[in-house]
């Protein structure tokens, strides 16, 4: 396997559109890197530049110690898995998996060994004689991965490989891909717009927007310590709630005023806000759905007075309940205990866990404190 280095990578099309802008990333050997972001953010374009399917307009791409900018795709020692499987319909599973090795004139006994080992890893041993039309979507995707595995490449590139599968199969295939990474110790770069895939699969995640890298970090850090408003809103489902808040001083302490509600700000966050010159200014307060509580015990322990609203929508998802209600004219989502007594149309009393709150600069959208 191999490390990768992307230094000041740019992609500009002939019409002047900049798809990727000054992309910098060092990928260690055996890492599982996720490129995530909304459609059109440049993640697939970056992957295709690594593969050699798109020309690099500027910057340097290295795999190991070798500069790859002008190396043909077939000579880069990478394998790519696409979302549409790209299987040959007239070939069996065995022949689809063996095809790339046959083109390279690998000896038959080595091909057979590689195919059967990949089939064992992917639980395809009983399907080797079938043709793609006789396979389910999940089985076809496993064959596409098997075709990549038999080549034993330095780097695996995966471009939204699960997007054509239903929800249940996506969960199963996420587990399969994690197992493959553990078994092979492979370097994997994986593109998705699904932040659940990103959070569950990646050792590190690259969040992109409009061709620009917003933040690179572990899933846990991206969730708990987002670097800006976009990352905070993109990572997490349901997304973080955002409310305008005026930072004020009261009795020697800082509070966040959200409409008529006064929320006590914990000391460390208060210091960051004061040091940043935000007293008297409007900032964006971020609070995740799971950090809004309607339990009487939490409300009584909260240093701030309870907030009130009316439940607009109640959603039961088995192990959890989502409540939707307004705070100062903005819709807020709370993830609460399923034993809650609140229902649609009911008045609700609740409190924010301000220890878990986030504050963002309203102009720059950068994080002030997490």
Positions of predicted regions on the chain:
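ABC ATPase nucleotide-binding domains
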Residues: 73-230, 234
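Short coil-to-beta microelement around the adenine-binding A-loop and adjacent beta1/P-loop entry
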Residues: 16-18
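The feature captures the beta-strand-to-loop junction immediately N-terminal to the Walker
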Residues: 36-38
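Helix-to-loop junction immediately C-terminal to a conserved catalytic motif
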Residues: 51
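Conserved coupling/switch loops of ABC nucleotide-binding domains, chiefly the family-specific signature
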Residues: 57-60, 110, 210, 357
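Conserved ABC transporter NBD signature motif
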Residues: 59-67
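Glycine/charge-rich catalytic "coupling/switch" loops of P-loop NTPases
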Residues: 253-311, 331, 341-370
């Amino acid at each position: 396997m191999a490390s990768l280095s992307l230094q000041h990578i740019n992609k500009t099309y002939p019409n002047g559109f900049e798809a990727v802008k000054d992309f910098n990333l060092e990928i260690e050997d055996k890492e599982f890197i996720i490129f995530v972001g909304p459609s059109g953010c440049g993640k697939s374009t970056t992957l295709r530049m690594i593969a050699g399917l798109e020309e690099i307009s500027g910057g340097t791409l290295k795999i190991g110690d070798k500069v790859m900018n002008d190396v043909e795709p077939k000579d880069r020692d990478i394998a790519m898995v696409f979302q549409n499987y790209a299987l040959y319909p007239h070939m069996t599973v065995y022949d689809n998996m063996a095809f790339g090795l046959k083109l390279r004139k690998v000896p038959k006994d080595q091909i057979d060994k590689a195919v059967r080992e990949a089939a064992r890893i992917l639980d395809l041993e009983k399907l080797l004689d079938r043709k793609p039309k006789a396979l389910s979507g999940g089985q076809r995707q496993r064959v596409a991965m098997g075709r990549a595995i038999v080549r034993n490449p330095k780097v695996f590139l995966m471009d939204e490989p699960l997007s054509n599968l239903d929800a249940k199969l996506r969960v199963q295939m996420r587990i399969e891909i994690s197992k493959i990474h553990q078994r092979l110790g492979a370097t994997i770069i994986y593109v998705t717009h699904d932040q659940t895939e990103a959070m569950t699969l990646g050792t590190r995640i690259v969040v992109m927007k409009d061709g620009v890298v917003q933040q690179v970090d572990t899933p846990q850090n991206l969730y708990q310590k987002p670097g800006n408003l976009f990352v905070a809103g993109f990572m997490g489902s349901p997304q973080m709630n955002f409310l305008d808040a005026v930072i004020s001083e009261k009795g020697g302490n800082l509070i966040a005023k959200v409409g008529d509600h006064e929320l006590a700000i914990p000391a460390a966050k208060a210091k960051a806000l004061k040091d940043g010159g935000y007293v008297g200014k409007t900032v964006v307060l971020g609070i995740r759905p799971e950090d809004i509580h309607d339990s009487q015990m939490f409300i009584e322990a909260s240093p701030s007075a309870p907030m009130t609203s009316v439940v607009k929508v109640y959603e039961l998802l088995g192990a959890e309940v989502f409540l939707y209600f307004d705070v100062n004219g903005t819709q807020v989502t709370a993830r609460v205990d399923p034993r809650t007594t609140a229902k649609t149309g009911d008045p609700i009393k609740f409190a924010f866990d301000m220890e878990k709150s986030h504050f963002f600069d309203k102009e720059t959208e950068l994080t002030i404190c997490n």
